[in-house]
A protein has these predicted regions:
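C-terminal, charged and often intrinsically disordered regions of DNA end-processing helicases
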Residues: 1-38, 267-270
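Anion-coordinating catalytic cores for phosphoryl-, nucleotidyl-, and glycosidic chemistry
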Residues: 1-20, 125, 139, 149-150, ...
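Metal-dependent nuclease catalytic regions and adjoining charged, substrate-binding loops involved
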Residues: 6, 147, 179-270
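Short, polar/flexible loop-turn hinges at active-site or ligand-entry regions and domain interfaces
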Residues: 28-37, 54-59, 162-163, 232-233
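Hydrophobic (often cysteine-bearing) scaffold residues that line and stabilize catalytic clefts
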Residues: 36, 40, 44, 96, ...
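Solvent-exposed, amphipathic alpha-helical segments
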Residues: 43-54, 224-228
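A non-catalytic, helix-rich entry segment at domain boundaries
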Residues: 47-121, 128
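Mg2+/Mn2+-dependent nuclease catalytic core
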Residues: 118-119, 123-218
Length: 270
């Protein structure tokens, strides 16, 4: 059995990309194998989170690089099987550490952490819409300027996508700006994406109209999700991304057969 009562940016983007993918992840909750890219991102995020534990003048690239080993050890202790599967030998571990170092060097070309005192790091945020749907997720970093302006920061360990493929990340940041508004009645001043792989940033300043548009967009999307749940209409959508989807072997669009949909016992707004 499953309940559809909450939505995160990643699951929302899953549905936009492919309703069946959303179902298999959010309702069936089928396991997926770990990937090197995801693990590398988790490692770099952990190092950047801990970087701000150091005194301001010690937040250097040397301190960050020195934090790779301890962060990796903590992840290995938490999930030794995944680390052993992805990085079975010293050569693979060394390559991972070098890749992490390169990404961290990229971060230091984008800002000076010595001048920042984040208000929050890796913060779980949530807020409820009027229809009962809970919006939730994790914000990498929240900064508050002396004048009170709020900046939400998200680290991306990949490269900045071309404009036609930037919608997913843009929606994610608008989603968090909406959650901030709903929970604090405060308009976020700046949304900033740091693409460490390409050493570039994307900065946006949301308006009240942007917040209203995002809420309407999410409500419309949730209506589509609710209808799919009520009719069991989780249609697959073939795209070039199918080649990277773990569920391709059981996808009807590719000749597969998915398992029966688990019973859905509750849907927000219904």
């Amino acid at each position: 059995m499953a309940e559809l009562l909450a939505l995160s940016p990643s699951r929302a983007n899953d549905f936009v990309q492919c309703p069946l993918k959303f179902r298999l992840r959010s309702i069936d909750r089928l396991p997926e194998p770990p990937s090197e890219a995801e693990f590398r991102g988790t490692l770099v995020h952990a190092v950047l989170e801990r970087l701000f534990d150091a005194e301001a003048d010690e937040r250097t690239i040397e301190t960050a690089v020195a934090g790779i080993g301890p962060a990796l050890d903590a992840l290995r202790e938490k999930d030794p099987e995944t680390v052993a599967q992805l990085f079975p030998g010293p050569d693979e571990v060394s390559r991972l550490q070098q890749q992490a170092r390169t990404l961290l060097e990229g971060y230091f070309t984008l800002e000076l952490p010595q001048k920042l005192e984040p208000a929050a790091r890796e913060e779980f945020v949530r807020a409820d819409l009027d229809n009962g749907l809970t919006l939730r997720g994790f914000v990498d970093r929240t900064d508050i300027a002396p004048g009170g302006h709020v900046r939400l920061v998200d680290y991306k360990t990949g490269k900045q996508p071309k404009p036609q493929y930037s919608g997913e990340a843009d929606f994610q940041m608008r989603f968090y700006a909406l959650v901030h508004w709903l929970s604090r009645r405060e308009l976020v001043h700046t949304l900033q994406l740091f693409y460490l792989g390409s050493r570039t940033t994307v900065t946006k300043r949301p308006t009240a109209a942007d917040i209203e548009r995002t809420e309407a967009e999410i409500l419309q999307l949730w209506e589509q999700i609710a209808r799919a749940a009520e009719s069991d209409g989780w249609r697959p959508r073939r795209t070039p991304l199918c080649g990277w989807c773990h569920f391709k072997p059981i996808c009807p669009a590719w000749g597969g057969t998915p398992p029966p949909t688990p019973e859905i016992t509750a849907i927000a707004g219904r």
